[in-house]
Amino acid sequence: MKWKILSFLGLGFGVAGMLWGYAQEKKAVGFFELRVYTAQPGKRDALASRFASRTAAIYARHGITNVGYFIPQQSDADLGISAENTFIYIRGYPSKEERDKRLKAAHDDPEFGEVVTKQEQDPNTRLIVKAHNIDLAPNGPYTAITISK
């Protein structure tokens, strides 16, 4: 009788652990954004610093995955990439619909307004000259990036 109770408890804890693990499982990203910013001359590092110190955390708080932030190592005139003034990053979401929802929430965040919007609206403190956005979908088995639900 004792072994039946212990077996039942063991099975119960095993199932509970499995379900908890499933609930914690990360879901694959289904939608990415490639963002390419041209910074004001001499302001690229300040822009990168703003992302590192504030903006990335705001995005993460709203469920946006900060996939990566990049500084080009060479210029490419055909692509409009300047090694001195270009800042590139990739964000990830479960879907385009989730992107729209999460990005709106991040942009409506009072901290975002204080840190980014206010600075970019003032011509004397603006860091970004122009921004390009390219929507991307995973292709093939090689996109091994996951984000939290």
Model-derived features with residue positions:
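Bacterial N-terminal signal peptides that target proteins for export
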Residues: M1-L9
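Bacterial Sec-dependent signal peptides at the C-terminal "C-region" and cleavage site
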Residues: L9-K26
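Intrinsic, low-complexity N-terminal interaction/targeting segments
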Residues: N66, I71-Q74
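Short, structured motif recognition centered on aromatic/hydrophobic residues
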Residues: F31-V36, L47, N85-G92
